[in-house]
Amino acid sequence: MPFITAASHRLEYALLNPHHTAAPWLVFLHEGLGSVAMWKDFPLKLCAATGCRGLVYSRHGYGKSDPLTAPRRADFMHDEARHALPELLDQLHIANPVLFGHSDGASIALLHAGLTSRPVAALVAMAPHVMVEDISIASIEAASVAWETTDLRERLRPYHDDPDSAFRGWNDIWLHPDFRSWNIEDCLPGIRCPVLAIQGVDDEYGTIDQIDRIARGAVNAEVELLKLADCRHSPHKDQPEAVIAAVQRFIARLP
């Protein structure tokens, strides 16, 4: 696995189908406990279905990337969107990508498209967070209990060199009192690319109000919503065929 330095941190990454030089780039931004390995073969399948090239990477604190050396701040997703992601894309010469974000990664994608002047061809936000809900806190508190009482650390070890860094970096900031008022709806009017927002109706980390707010708030973008039945917080695992088909149609309509 190659590494690259962005925002002063060593990050692991993988390029998919890089020889397809005329194809658009799909940039995958993982969830709050995700990594390159955690995606498994989904990025390859989606790139094959859409004819895209792909970039998959682990953010600081995850996978084989540098572990955290300090607690995350409440604005950590803003920092990722404004600094780490642009530096990474510039170094890899990736311009005008289609961003595919899951959970925290979807929030970072929304922030990047809404707050920076960088061109984004389109954005897929899967199980995104635009504000903190009671259901989010309850599920993250339950994860904290599982961390202390089950083998969750060992189950995360195949996906993270430092599972403590990955878990604590995610869990501690989401449960911090300063994070309860976190809200990124103010970035939504700045999004000017097509958006596909996907959420499972049984998502244990957020209600359908999350993507409904994107539809209301992204007033300068064309927003398509996909609400999936029998689907929880990871639609690409619970309903992979539906997700791939929807993204394939979405990308095929792009100019």
Question: Residue ranges of each PLM-predicted region?
Answer:
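Active-site loop/oxyanion-hole signature of alpha/beta-hydrolase fold enzymes
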Residues: 50, 56-96
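Conserved hydrolase catalytic core segment
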Residues: 95-133
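Short beta-strand/loop motif that positions the catalytic acidic residue
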Residues: 191, 197-199
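Short alpha-helix in the alpha/beta-hydrolase fold that links the catalytic acid
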Residues: 193, 207-216
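Catalytic histidine-centered segment of alpha/beta-hydrolase-like enzymes
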Residues: 231-240, 244
